[in-house]
A protein has these predicted regions:
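Loop/turn elements at helix/coil->beta-strand transitions in domains of secreted/extracellular proteins
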Residues: 29-35, 70-74, 99-102, 114-116, ...
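Active-site nucleophile/metal-coordination loop of metallo-enzymes that catalyze phosphate/sulfate
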Residues: 1-63, 72
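Solvent-exposed loop/turn segments at secondary-structure junctions
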Residues: 4-7, 34, 40-44, 80-84, ...
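Active-site His/acidic residue clusters
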Residues: 45-50, 123-132, 150-185
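Acidic, His- and aromatic-enriched active-site or binding-groove loops in soluble protein domains
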Residues: 51-78, 97-106
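Active-site regions of oxyanion-processing enzymes, predominantly non-cytosolic
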Residues: 106-120, 140-162
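Long, well-ordered, tryptophan-enriched scaffold segments
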Residues: 75-128, 133-134
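Stable alpha-helical elements in mature extracytoplasmic
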Residues: 16-23, 59-63, 68, 72, ...
Length: 185
């Protein structure tokens, strides 16, 4: 999301591993509200590309630490264990609370328009539609749009339907069909 070519597995850094400004960071500096929704861990490569700067996409604990101090107004997805079951024993949920986030680690609840909102509700990723996920993607998207609307500012929202890609890699046509239909809601 930087617009610059880099090396395989890099997140938000140049070929020389120098941090590059992401589109989310650029828009935030211009007064936009920002949001990320993912069916996988919020520290996974696609969402991380919008706020993190690391040499390797599997540096989930470092990516979570960067998210805890990033300027993201609304986030929803999985990855709970990278915030509270860390090798360094840091509690990044406390960091989010200290930064005035409305935080829910159990469910997608109602956002609060006067706060930043974080819904990190699974240890890793959410289940696929074929595994019974329900309407998380639709509900998270609607909640984010409601939040942004209440604040009446321009916004940037990245919504990732992770399982469309994963279903393709697995050659699982049923998963892909259900995930595309879910994303289309």
């Amino acid at each position: 999301s930087t617009g610059e070519k880099t090396y395989k597995r890099a997140i938000g850094v140049s070929k020389d591993s120098i941090p590059q400004e992401t589109i989310l960071e650029k828009l935030k500096a211009e007064g936009y509200q920002t949001g990320l929704i993912s069916l996988t861990s919020i520290t996974h490569a696609t969402p991380a590309a919008f706020y993190a700067h690391v040499k390797d996409r599997d540096m989930h604990e470092e990516i979570a630490a960067q998210l805890a101090t990033a300027d993201v107004d609304f986030l929803a997805g999985g990855g709970r264990k990278f915030f509270n079951e860390r090798s360094d024993d840091q509690d990044l949920f406390q960091t989010l609370l200290n930064r005035n986030y409305n935080l829910d680690t159990l469910a997608l609840s109602k956002s609060k328009p006067d706060m930043r909102n974080a819904f990190i509700i699974e240890d890793e990723g959410l289940p696929s539609k074929t595994e019974g996920r329900g309407d998380f993607l639709k509900n998270a998207s609607l909640e984010a749009l409601s939040y942004f609307d209440a604040n009446n500012k321009p916004f940037f929202l990245m919504i990732e339907g992770s399982y469309i890609d994963w279903g393709g890699h697995a050659k699982d046509a049923e998963m892909m069909i259900q995930e595309v239909a879910d994303f289309d809601q």
